[in-house]
Regions:
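Composition- and surface-driven signal marking solvent-exposed, interaction-prone regions
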Residues: 28-32, 154-162
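Glycan-recognition surfaces
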Residues: 41-157
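Membrane-embedded transmembrane-helix bundle of lipid-linked glycan/lipid transferases
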Residues: 167-170
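Active-site-proximal structural scaffolding
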Residues: 7, 29-36, 133-136
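Carbohydrate-binding surface patches
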Residues: 131, 135-137, 141-149, 180-206
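Substrate-binding cleft of carbohydrate-active enzyme catalytic domains
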Residues: 1-24, 35, 42-47, 52-54
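Extracytoplasmic/secreted cell-surface and envelope-processing proteins
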Residues: 22-26, 61-64
Length: 206
């Protein structure tokens, strides 16, 4: 499979998902963590100098072995999923939780791999996030993440959406100088030589 993807098709990067499936259990001679580390090392060895975006993977076993890694849950098309999913599942799709993961795991970015906080949205179709929720998601990902991707189809963007996309892309080049989470999320950053401070209240995204 990897020969086909790398050598025949010519891809230089693969996204490998659901990697936690390599180590659902340990045994008396090998812990889950050790088994997971061995699996990631195997993927690293066969990928050689090709880049890996790991997803659905325990973070620590992949330190230093992949170029990029998802560092939280999937974002959703709404803010925090439906109520019964919140009652039944600790690990689930949640835009709110994805933002919290992006903030709280920001220190890993550029140290053990580049953080992938999942995608952001600008589109208005097939989405139940408010404009502010979409804007907060994109800005936090741009400032604190290491991978900045959208699942939108840019072909459907209006001129205003294109302008907003370029604004977010520029924000991704900012230098973050301080992050405070005592009351909400406050991020201080420098862009074009100017210091800026923005505040987010991610309790309900309003």
């Amino acid at each position: 499979v990897f020969h086909q993807v790398y050598d025949v098709w010519g891809f230089d990067l693969v996204k490998l998902d659901f990697l936690y499936g390599a180590a659902p259990f340990g045994n008396a001679s090998e812990s889950r963590a050790k088994r997971m580390k061995r699996a990631i090392q195997f993927l690293r060895d066969i990928s050689k100098d090709k880049e890996i975006l790991a997803c659905g993977v325990p973070l620590m076993p992949s330190f230093g072995l992949v170029e990029y890694s998802r560092i939280g849950c999937d974002v959703g098309l709404d803010w925090d999923d439906v109520f019964y999913m919140r009652l039944l599942h600790r690990e689930r799709i949640s835009t709110k939780n994805a933002i919290v993961n992006t903030v709280n795991r920001r220190q890993l970015n550029g140290r053990v791999f580049m953080n992938d906080p999942d995608v952001f949205f600008i589109r208005t179709e097939n989405i139940h996030l408010t404009d502010k929720q979409k804007d907060d998601l994109a800005r936090i990902q741009a400032l604190l993440g290491g991978v900045f991707l959208t699942s939108d189809s840019p072909a459907n963007y209006t001129d205003d959406m294109i302008r907003k996309y370029h604004e977010y892309r520029k924000l991704a080049s900012a230098l973050v100088t301080d992050v405070n989470t005592d009351e909400g999320i406050t991020i201080e950053y420098v862009l074009d030589g100017k210091t800026n401070v923005i505040h987010f209240d991610c309790t309900n995204g309003k």
